[in-house]
From Swiss-Prot:
Keywords: Cleavage on pair of basic residues, Disulfide bond, Hormone, Pyrrolidone carboxylic acid, Secreted, Signal. This is Prorelaxin 1. The keyword Disulfide bond applies. InterPro entries: Insulin-like, Insulin-like_sf, Insulin_CS, Relaxin, Repro_Hormone_Insulin-like. Relaxin is an ovarian hormone that acts with estrogen to produce dilatation of the birth canal in many mammals. The keyword Signal applies. One of its GO terms (biological process) is regulation of body fluid levels. It is found in: Secreted. Residues 58-158 form a propeptide. GO terms for cellular component: extracellular region. Residues 1-22 form the signal peptide.
């Protein structure tokens, strides 16, 4: 019985003495690997899946400009400095200045507004107004993309990310690449 306990303790001690794979050395990240096809996919999952890529990027460079630009467009209920009905007022262009002031001050809306509120929420006009406002705040999107992605401004960004991923996979296959360069795509 005591030999069985000692064997289990020895196994437990060996298990604990193994180095943690979550800690990654700089040499491992900077090692040049040459992988193709499924091997590239496995390497990408290995680097990005364990959040190693995020740690490597946090040490290397600040956030890209595209992420900083999208951080400016925050709904008013999240952004504490914004006025509460900022987006609502922009989407209702036919509202008089007096009623807009009442909404922005937080006073009870006029009864006429309460009876038209369901119609405004379902109307295509208010949706188009919201899309135009959202589009203007994000900046110009490429005209070649589909209209759904045109207003979101993500078509050009996602296309660039896909193209850079394809170029990197070809480079990793033919020439070789570092795990750190794969981590930039995470």
């Amino acid at each position: 019985m005591s030999s069985r306990l000692l064997l289990q303790l020895l196994g437990f001690w060996l298990f604990l003495s193994q180095p943690c794979r979550a800690r990654v050395s700089e040499e491992w990240m900077d090692q040049v690997i040459q992988v193709c096809g499924r091997g590239y996919a496995r390497a990408w999952i290995e680097v990005c899946g364990a959040s190693v890529g995020r740690l490597a990027l946090s040490q290397e460079e600040p956030a890209p400009l595209a992420r900083q630009a999208t951080a400016e467009v925050v709904p008013s209920f999240i952004n504490k400095d914004a006025e509460p009905f900022d987006m609502t007022l922009k989407c209702l262009p036919n509202l008089s200045e007096e009623r807009k002031a009442a909404l922005s001050e937080g006073r009870a809306p006029f009864p006429e507004l309460q009876q038209h509120a369901p119609a405004l929420s379902d109307s295509v006009v208010s949706l188009e107004g919201f899309k135009k406002t959202f589009h203007n705040q994000l900046g110009e999107a490429e005209d070649g993309g589909p209209p759904e992605l045109k207003y979101l401004g993500s078509d050009a960004q996602s296309r660039k990310k896909r193209q850079s991923g394809a170029l990197l996979s070809e480079q990793c296959c033919h020439i070789g690449c570092t795990r750190r360069s794969i981590a930039k795509l995470c």
